């Protein structure tokens, strides 16, 4: 027994007693003292350590009675009572903690570490028996452990608080170092709060009574058996204690080398709070409050019945965890660095990133009974927010107003990034360098597209990369082989100075509604009684669920079952710009260049996602409202539904919505100027996307099972995209309402993403580029990108219905809709539509695909053009070889192939169409764009000739071939658009520019093809002449000697037989002659395919159609070999006048021996051309005739023959000259030649023959003029009919002898 008038101080005392009767007149102190020591180590580290001294213990083996006139102070002290405890504290009873820890500072060579680590030791009360504790003031326990073995009562006139003790530990550190070329500095700060809650335990019923408030904060009341009863005159607060964690860091790193340096700076600031909720657990729990009961982020649970009764409000809500984070990162490089690909830079680059994020997360409360009932009564409002009420049996909530709704989680994220780069860059230039650079960039782009799941763009980038590798390789090989000239590839080194900047900002804000739930194994009943105020007595359940066997919602006024809404808002923007100027030096000399580009974009999206309320009863759901009942964004599901609505019944579905929009645009251009030429280019892109979605995800309605529905509504029943349904027999369904209105909800989904762009460019002289419109020397164009269009539209209807059953309209005079038209099928009512895709990502992928398609389009068109050029060259070479060996059928076939592979040819166009289909399909993503690409490419290739005409016409008008070429490209683009849309326009432009416009050999090859065709026609006609006897009229019959191809006997004037093509002599028939006025007979003509003609005179001749047939390869001998006939024609006599000798080809002499012109003779010189034309000479001479601006293959062939027989070398006379050719070497050096009668085609020859007699006088006048101006005037008479030849010879005989001496007749 201890009785004092003053204080009893048991600080760090150890008191033991069998029983205790302590009466302190003032304070009772049961503290454990602390002690602090200070230490300094050898290395200078300091330590201040606080520890507990001897523990303060008051140990009573039996019963204890403690009475104080003042406070009972207990800090880390221990009260242990083996029996019963009877305490009467006159003041406050404070059960606190003592804080211990160590503050340590360590100084190192590279920095300082400052740590302060703390912990708390709480007080304890352990009672083996029953407890009867009365406190005249407040009872406050922080971080304490209280164990009331057999329960009892704890009562205070003031507040009773079971709370958490808090300690904070901090770490502060900094370090730095410098190693010459490397340095760093870093600082770190961390502060962590630790909470130690109070724990109250007991073995039997414990009563906690307060004259004011009861607070259980971050603490636990846990009874093994018995009930936990909390009764307060004020509030009862069961809540969470919040601990805070802070982390801050700063770092800088730098590295410097001989040629480069790097600096990195980063920071991180993070703060988070964590709510530690409370727990009250016992067999049964009863909480009573004279004011409010607040359960926040905590759990109140009993094995049996749990009851909460408050005179005012009961709030069962959430606690919240929060976080805020901010990071920065800056990186700066200076000096030598990679410039991308095979280039390097010297300069500065900077990267700055900032990220911010924050969040609020709700922690639900749970109040309930495991196998008993849960009863919650509030005099005013029962509010369940983001929390759960649960009972194994019944849940009953009664209040003036009841709100069961959701708590809102929020997240915010924001990112910013800025980059800049400036300095000098050294890289490859020239066409080969450009191809290499683009191959690298396209390869990287293909990888990025694949990462972005853009397979089409990845494939197109890969095609472009492969093409760039191939073009670069071909160009490099050509350079190694010593290629020269305007079309030769180039390579060089470029040094440029420039800068670039980019920025990006994005943010996303989300709200997520965490609904409440009420779950009962038996009945769930919510009753809103109202408090006598009008419009009071409401039940509102928002975005939450009620589940029970039977659910009853009874409201004095309204029952509101409504949805909640999640939101998601995103915003983004970006911009970039750059410019550079440079100087290059390479195989094309010295050049300068400049470029600039700019881009910007933005995107926004707002989404709303609805969360329906659900009332689920396995048996019966009952709704009774004195006013309206609103089932909006909610569902009532039960086996049987009973509703008695004193106002209106409104049932409506709500739609999820998404509205999004994005924009992106870019533009750029540049120019290059070198010693060999220059070029300029410009490109632009623009994209817009938008999406709009509104759709009912979950239809609202009242759904009954086999029990049916019995709904009575005093006012109007309105269904908006909603239903009252049942699976029961119609006899169990009844709707009685004043009036009934219904309507449907239209759902829709629309999105559209469109991207368009173009590139334009031109070059003069020799281009130094490998990619883009300015890469084609001396040309240019405008190439549209393959238009990107992704869109979708869907619509559907959410219908209203009432299942079959009785519908009773109690106010028929007010009914406006015909109930007979009501939809009675309450199944499959919700027509859904798909949500819109991410339009901003779609826009980004479209831009990528457009760029990839443009790059690949050039590769494919240009590659096919190169392939076709090669095929054309191969066919020309094969045609020449066939001519050399006399195989005219094969020659014609190869000429046809060369034409087919030429610009405008079918083979080239077919292959371009295939390439167009590939690029159009991949670029546009559909069969239609593939068809469009094929149509545009094929049409552009087929109409290459028309484009050339446009180019020449515009070029002539403007005086600029470049303008003409651009006009041709624009025309091709328009034509492609007409036949193939966007893909057609893009591919048509590509084909015109990179195929037809990039074909430097086409003019020469076309001349060669035309010349070969002319040679073929001439040779075939000569073969026809030999077979048909056309020679007879020009050479005396006595001089004709024909070499039979198979070596058979000769036919001569002494042997009046004649020869057919099978090598056999035919018997002479009466009336048939061989002479100047007749041709060979029927067998010969039949062999020509001319039918069974009798002997005919020269006036009939062989028609132009016959010659055309010969020229097309129809002329064959009996064995099918045209070459034999041709060889026979070649072996005709040649010479001067009428005394020709046998061809050298038949006598073993060198073919092509020279003869001398008449040189003053009074008669024309006659040449019988028998040898094939020398193709090398023909190619040299077949150039544009400046007088007419065209190729003249007829003149070229005749000139080659003239060289062969007269010797020397001819060349085209310069523009303005009145003659065709001039000898530049040989015996006639310096003399001029002016040809006549040298048709280029069989059709021209036929026309000459048709009108020769009528135009003879004009012809002879022209002949006289030519003979007066030129030294030689060759006349190719081989294409004239016999009658016209006779007229020509007679007319020449009438000319002055001086002029006749200049004439050379070619036969």
From Swiss-Prot:
Residues 252-991 are annotated as: Pretoxin (PT) domain. A motif (ELYN C-terminal motif) lies at residues 992-995. Residues 508-518, 1125-1147 have a biased composition (Polar residues). Its main location: cytoplasm. Residues 1147-1307 are annotated as: C-terminal effector domain (CT), has tRNA nuclease activity. Residues 317-336, 491-507, 1148-1163 have a biased composition (Low complexity). It is an enzyme of class 3 (hydrolase). Keywords: Endonuclease, Hydrolase, Nuclease, RNA-binding, Target cell cytoplasm, Toxin, tRNA-binding, Virulence. The active site is at residues 1195, 1220, 1234, 1266. GO terms for molecular function: endonuclease activity; toxin activity; tRNA binding. Its EC number is 3.1.-.-. Residues 996-1193 are annotated as: Probable inner membrane translocation domain. Specifically interacts with cognate immunity protein CdiI, which blocks its tRNA nuclease activity. The CT domain forms a tetramer both with and without tRNA; each subunit binds tRNA in its presence. The C-terminal domain (CT) has toxic activity, which can be exchanged between N-terminal sections from different toxin molecules. This is tRNA nuclease CdiA. The gene is cdiA.
């Amino acid at each position: 027994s201890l009785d004092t008038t003053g204080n009893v101080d048991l600080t760090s005392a150890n008191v033991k007693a069998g029983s205790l009767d302590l009466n302190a007149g003032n304070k009772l102190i049961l503290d454990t003292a602390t002690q602090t020591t200070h230490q300094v180590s050898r290395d200078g580290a300091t330590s201040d350590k606080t520890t507990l001294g001897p523990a303060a213990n008051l140990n009573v083996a039996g019963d204890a009675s403690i009475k104080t006139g003042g406070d009972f102070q207990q800090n880390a002290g221990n009260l242990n009572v083996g029996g019963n405890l009877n305490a009467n504290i006159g003041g406050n009873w404070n059960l606190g903690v003592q804080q211990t820890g160590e503050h340590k500072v360590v100084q190192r060579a590279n920095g300082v570490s400052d740590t302060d680590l703390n912990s708390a030791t709480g007080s304890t009360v352990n009672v083996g028996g029953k407890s009867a504790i009365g406190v005249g003031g407040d009872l406050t326990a922080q971080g304490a452990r209280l164990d009331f073995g057999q329960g009892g009562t704890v009562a205070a006139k003031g507040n009773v608080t079971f709370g958490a003790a808090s300690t904070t530990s901090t770490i502060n550190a900094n370090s730095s170092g410098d190693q010459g070329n490397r340095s760093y500095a870093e600082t770190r700060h961390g502060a962590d709060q630790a909470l130690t809650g109070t724990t109250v335990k007991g073995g039997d019923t414990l009563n906690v009574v307060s004259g004011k408030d009861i607070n259980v904060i971050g603490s636990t009341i846990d009874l093994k058996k018995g009930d936990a009863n909390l009764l307060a005159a004020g509030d009862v607060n069961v809540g969470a204690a919040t601990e805070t964690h802070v982390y801050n860091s700063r770092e800088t790193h730098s590295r410097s080398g001989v040629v480069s340096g790097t600096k990195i700076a980063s920071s991180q600031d993070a703060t988070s709070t964590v709510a530690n909720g409370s727990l009250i657990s016992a067999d049964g729990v009863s909480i009573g409050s004279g004011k409010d009961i607040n359960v926040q982020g905590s759990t109140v649970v009993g094995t049996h019945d749990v009851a909460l009764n408050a005179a005012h409000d009961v709030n069962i809500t959430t606690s919240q965890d929060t976080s805020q984070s901010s990071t920065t990162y800056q990186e700066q490089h200076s000096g030598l660095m990679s410039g991308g690909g095979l280039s390097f830079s010297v300069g500065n680059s900077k990267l700055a990133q900032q990220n911010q994020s924050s969040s609020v997360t709700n922690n639900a409360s749970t109040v309930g009974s495991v196998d008993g009932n849960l009863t919650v009564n509030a005099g005013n409002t029962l509010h369940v927010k983001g929390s759960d009420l649960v009972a194994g049996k019944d849940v009953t909530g009664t209040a003036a107003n009841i709100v069961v709704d959701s708590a809102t989680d929020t997240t915010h994220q924001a990112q910013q990034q800025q980059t800049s780069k400036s300095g000098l860059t050294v890289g490859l230039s020239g066409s080969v360098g450009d191809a290499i650079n683009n191959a690298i960039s396209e390869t990287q782009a293909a990888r990025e597209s694949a990462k972005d799941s853009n397979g089409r763009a990845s494939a197109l980038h890969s095609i472009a990369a492969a093409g760039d590798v191939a073009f670069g390789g071909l160009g490099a090989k050509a350079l190694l082989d010593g290629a020269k000239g305007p079309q030769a590839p180039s390579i060089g080194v470029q040094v440029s100075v420039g800068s670039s900047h980019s920025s990006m900002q994005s943010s996303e804000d989300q709200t997520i509604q965490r609904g409440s739930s009420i779950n009962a194994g038996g009945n769930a009943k919510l009753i809103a009684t109202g408090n006598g105020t009008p419009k009071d007595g409401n039940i509102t359940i928002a975005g939450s669920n009620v589940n029970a066997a039977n659910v009853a919602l009874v409201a004095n006024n309204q029952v509101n079952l409504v949805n909640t809404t999640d939101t998601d808002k995103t915003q983004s923007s970006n911009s970039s710009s750059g410019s550079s100027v440079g100087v290059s030096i390479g195989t094309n000399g010295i050049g300068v260049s400049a470029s600039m580009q700019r881009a910007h974009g933005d995107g926004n999206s707002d989404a709303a996602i609805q969360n329906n309320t659900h009332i689920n009863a396995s048996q019966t759901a009952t709704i009774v409202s004195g006013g309206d009942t609103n089932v909006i964004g909610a569902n009532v599901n039960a086996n049987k539904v009973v509703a008695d609505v004193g106002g209106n019944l409104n049932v409506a579905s709500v739609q999820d919505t998404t509205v999004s929009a994005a924009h992106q645009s870019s533009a750029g251009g540049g120019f290059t100027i070198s010693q060999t030429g220059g070029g300029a280019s410009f490109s632009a892109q623009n994209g817009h996307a938008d999406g709009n979605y509104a759709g009912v995800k979950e239809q609202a309605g009242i759904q009954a099972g086999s029990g049916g529905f019995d709904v009575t509504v005093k006012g109007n029943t309105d269904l908006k995209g909603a239903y009252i349904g049942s699976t029961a027999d119609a006899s169990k369904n009844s709707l009685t309402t004043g009036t009934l209105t219904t309507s449907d909800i239209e759902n829709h989904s629309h999105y559209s993403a469109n991207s368009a762009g173009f590139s334009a460019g031109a070059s003069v002289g020799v281009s130094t580029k490998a990619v883009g419109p300015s890469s084609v020397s001396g040309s240019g164009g405008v190439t549209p990108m393959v238009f990107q269009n992704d869109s979708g539209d869907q619509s559907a209807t959410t219908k209203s219905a009432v299942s079959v059953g009785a519908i009773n309209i109690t106010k028929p005079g007010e009914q406006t809709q015909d109930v007979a038209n009501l939809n009675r099928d309450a199944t499959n009512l919700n027509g859904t539509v798909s949500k819109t895709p991410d339009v901003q990502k779609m826009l980004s992928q479209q831009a990528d695909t457009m760029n990839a398609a443009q790059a690949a389009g050039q590769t494919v068109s240009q590659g096919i053009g190169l392939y076709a050029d090669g095929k054309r060259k191969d066919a020309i070479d094969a045609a020449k070889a066939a001519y050399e060996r006399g195989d005219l059928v094969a020659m014609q076939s190869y000429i046809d192939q060369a034409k087919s592979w030429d610009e405008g040819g079918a083979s080239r166009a077919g292959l371009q169409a295939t390439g167009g289909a590939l690029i159009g399909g991949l670029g546009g993503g559909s069969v239609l764009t593939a068809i469009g690409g094929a149509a545009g490419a094929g049409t552009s290739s087929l109409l290459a000739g028309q484009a050339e005409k446009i180019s020449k016409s515009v070029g002539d008008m403007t005086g600029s071939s470049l303008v003409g070429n651009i006009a041709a490209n624009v025309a091709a683009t328009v034509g492609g658009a007409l036949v193939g849309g966007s893909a057609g326009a893009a591919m048509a432009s590509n084909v015109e520019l990179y195929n037809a416009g990039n074909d430097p050999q086409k003019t020469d090859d076309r001349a060669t093809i035309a010349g070969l065709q002319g040679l073929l026609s001439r040779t075939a006609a000569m073969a026809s002449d030999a077979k048909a006897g056309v020679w007879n009229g020009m050479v005396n019959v006595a001089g004709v000697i024909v070499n039979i191809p198979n070596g058979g006997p000769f036919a001569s004037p002494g042997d009046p037989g004649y020869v057919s093509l099978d090598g056999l002599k035919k018997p002479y028939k009466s009336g048939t002659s061989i002479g100047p006025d007749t041709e060979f007979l029927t067998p010969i003509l039949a062999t020509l395919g001319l039918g069974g003609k009798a002997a005919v005179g020269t006036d009939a001749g062989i028609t132009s159609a016959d010659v055309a047939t010969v020229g097309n390869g129809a002329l064959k001998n009996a064995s099918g070999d045209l070459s034999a006939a041709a060889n026979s024609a070649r072996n005709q006599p040649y010479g001067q006048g009428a005394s020709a000798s046998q061809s050298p080809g038949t006598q073993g002499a060198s073919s092509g021996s020279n003869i001398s012109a008449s040189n003053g003779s009074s008669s024309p010189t006659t040449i019988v051309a028998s040898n094939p034309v020398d193709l090398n000479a023909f190619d040299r001479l077949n150039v544009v005739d400046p007088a007419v601006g065209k190729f003249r293959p007829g003149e070229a062939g005749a000139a080659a023959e003239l060289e062969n027989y007269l010797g020397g070398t001819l060349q085209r006379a310069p523009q303005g000259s009145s003659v065709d050719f001039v000898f530049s070497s040989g015996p006639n050096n310096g003399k001029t030649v002016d040809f006549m009668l040298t048709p280029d085609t069989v059709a021209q020859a036929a026309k000459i023959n048709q009108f020769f007699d009528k135009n003879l006088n004009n012809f002879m006048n022209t002949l006289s003029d030519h003979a007066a101006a030129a030294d030689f005037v060759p006349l190719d008479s081989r294409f004239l009919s016999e009658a016209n030849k006779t007229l020509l010879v007679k007319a020449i005989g009438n000319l002055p002898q001086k002029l006749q001496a200049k004439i050379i007749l070619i036969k």
